[in-house]
Amino acid sequence: MVTPSQHALLAEGVAHLTDARTAPALCALLKQYLEELILFNTRAHLVHVTHTEELITHHLLDSLSAWPHFTNARAIADIGSGAGLPGIPLACALALYAPETELTLIERREKRIAFLENACARLALPHLRIVHADAHDLTPYTYDAITFRALCPLNHPTVYMLLNKLRPGGVILAYKGKRKLIEQETRDFLPQSCSVFPLHVPFLHEARHLVAIHTPCAAPPQ
C-alpha cells in the first residue's frame, strides 16, 4: 500500500505539475494506479525500481510532466506501454483537462496486458483502452499523437514505421533524457520536423526532454 509519506510526495509532485482545482482528483487517480503498480510489480517485475518513491518520481511524475503537450490530440497511442507508462498517468490528467481524448495502450506481451486490464478496470476511465498487438500491426493514419518512453532510439526504423500510423498533421512525442543524446539520434532529421522541449519533473534531478517528431522527418534508413 501507499504510505502517508509516499502519498504526500505524489500529491506535492502533482500540485507542481497541475493546478489547485484538479490536483486532488488527479492525485486520487494516480494513487489508485500506484497501488496497483506496487501490488503487481513485486511478482510481475513490471518496472525496475529499488523503492516506491522511485516509482513516483522516475515514472509517474515523469510521465505526467508532459501532459500539456497532448491536450490538442483526440486519439493518442502509447506504444509498448508495458506498465502503462506514460499512458496511464497521461490518461488520468487528460480525463480532467481534455475528457474527450481517447488514449490507447498498445502492448504485445501477455503479462503486461493482464496488469493493464486490472489497472484500467480500477481507474474506470471511459476513454482509456487497451490493444493487445504489435505496433507494426496497427492501422495506418489512426492517431493524432503517438508516444513512448523506452521503446527505441529516435533514429530506429520503428520510429519511421510509427509515422505511418499518424493522421495528417500528427506527431510522435517521445520521452528522452540528455539533450546531447537526442541531438545524436536526430542528426539526420529535417530541421523543421523535430522540436525538443525540456521537462521539469518534481524531485527528479536528471535531464528530461520531450521530443516532437512530425512527418516527414527524413528518409527511412536503408
Curated annotation (Swiss-Prot):
One of its GO terms (cellular component) is cytosol. It comes from the Bacteria. Signal peptide: none annotated. S-adenosyl-L-methionine binds at G80, L85, R149. Its EC number is 2.1.1.-. Coiled coil: none annotated. Specifically methylates the N7 position of a guanine in 16S rRNA. This is Ribosomal RNA small subunit methyltransferase G.
